[in-house]
Amino acid sequence: MDRHSSYFFIWLQLELCAMAVLLTKGEIRCYCDAAHCVATGYMCKSELSACFSRLLDPQNTNSPLTHGCLDSLASTADICRAKQAQNHSGPAMPTLECCHEDMCNYRGLHDVLSPSKSEASGQGNRYQHDSSRNLITKMQELTSSKELWFRAAVIAVPIAGGLILVLLIMLALRMLRSENKRLQDERQQMLSRLHYSFHGHHSKKGQVAKLDLECMVPVSGQENCCLTCDKMRQAELSNEKILSLVHWGMYSGHGKLEFI
């Protein structure tokens, strides 16, 4: 008992450690347009809590953008630090930018990095930021609803499968019981027929044996054939088409029957 309790406490401590690691290890969701993110709704989770947006062609400022989690890059977050230092030191257009909020890289790279040059541009950026936030919120709600339906399906499908399996087992048991009952009825009928035929055959056989015994015993020393017995035997066995082939011979004084 003590051994099992010690195992239980060790397992509980391991579970608590794993939960603590998961809680301390932050993850954020990022917009991802890579091929491997299509199945996950164009989203990925970053264990480094960093998303990126960059130009596919650094030499062309109008180049299309690519987005994703920083974990998918070859290096770590040092790329973001180096690029940030380069961005602050020179006026050149940056080719990569990192952010650390959920779906923060959904906006374009130019919208994220371009500073507001005037009050009008600041208001436009603020309006675009609000609209992008609303879009991000809608995407998160859609993803949450998809996850909810997926969890419901994961729970409902095994339950439905179990119910179908139980119904199939009950149907199979019912079929087996009906088949067993039918076989028992057929067996009972067969046994009844055999019983009746066996007893009827023995009763007829007993009557024939009794008639043979009466015919074998000589009556008052007569030496002629037992014609009366033969007639009685023929009358009894007329239904079965059996004829008596036994003819009694002369009865000698030594008590022996001789057949002719």
From Swiss-Prot:
| Molecular-function annotations in GO | frizzled binding
Q: Which Pfam families match?
A: BAMBI (PF06211), BAMBI_C (PF19337)
Q: Which UniProt keywords apply?
A: Glycoprotein, Membrane, Signal, Transmembrane, Transmembrane helix
Gene Ontology terms describing biological process: cell migration; negative regulation of BMP signaling pathway; negative regulation of osteoblast differentiation; negative regulation of transforming growth factor beta receptor signaling pathway; positive regulation of canonical Wnt signaling pathway; positive regulation of cell population proliferation; positive regulation of DNA-templated transcription; positive regulation of epithelial to mesenchymal transition
Gene3D superfamilies for the chain: CD59
Q: What is its main location?
A: membrane
Signal peptide (from-to): 1-26
Q: Which InterPro entries does the protein's record reference?
A: BAMBI, BAMBI_C, BAMBI_N, Snake_toxin-like_sf
Q: Where are the transmembrane segments?
A: 153-173
Top-rank taxon, per record:
Eukaryota
Extracellular topological domain residue ranges? 27-152
One GO term of the cellular component aspect?
A: membrane
> Where do the record's glycosylation annotations fall on this chain?
N87
Question: Which ranges of this chain reside in the Cytoplasmic compartment per its record?
Answer: 174-260
Membrane topology according to the record: Single-pass type I membrane protein
The UniProt similarity line reads: Belongs to the BAMBI family.
Q: What does the record give as the function of this protein?
A: Negatively regulates TGF-beta signaling.
What protein does this entry describe?
BMP and activin membrane-bound inhibitor homolog
Q: Which organism is it from?
A: Mus musculus
Query: Lineage of this protein's species?
Result: Eukaryota, Metazoa, Chordata, Craniata, Vertebrata
